[in-house]
Amino acid sequence: QGVQLAYHHHMGTIVETSEEIDLLMENTADSLGLLLDTGHLTYAGGDPIATFEKYQNRIVHVHLKDIRTEVLKDAQNRNLSFLDSVLNGVFTVPGDGDIDYLSLFIALREAQYSGWLVVEAEQDPAIAKPLIYAKLGFNNIQHFAQKAGLNLTVPWA
């Protein structure tokens, strides 16, 4: 009681694409929330902003992960596995890739989203130093939030 369940779509699972998210949402009760993962949805060819707008009443958690489109195209051209794509640097922190985070943050503000926003990178720590990228991601989401007029609460501040 009092616990909100949410499904996390993810590459390598039964729900990866926008169409599969649609099927999940259409065939489950409204009480099941959705964790929107911007990087994984973009990797699967989806649009995180359109998905947020479509399911904003059921999204209870957001993973903010950016994608490097050129690395993704190279991985697709070479038929690399998902894991090899990750190791080649397909993902990064928000603002260091090609997802339109300003538009997403405007949509979050307009929907009065109040759930968690969690920065993820899924990068090789030997190449992308975690502390450097954690700071970069934090600074970038602060910048996008300010430009979008979205007030963020930092849990440790």
Tell me the role of every PLM-derived stretch.
Residues Q1, T51, D100, L104, ...:
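Alpha-helical packing segments of well-folded alpha/beta enzyme cores
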Residues Q1-G33:
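Active-site acidic/histidine proton-transfer and metal-coordination neighborhood
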Residues H10-G12, D37-L41, K65-I67, F91, ...:
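Active-site beta-loop-alpha junctions enriched in small/polar residues
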Residues L23-N27, A107, N140, F144:
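A generic secondary-structure signal
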Residues A128-T153:
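C-terminal helical cap(s) of enzyme catalytic domains, especially alpha/beta-barrels
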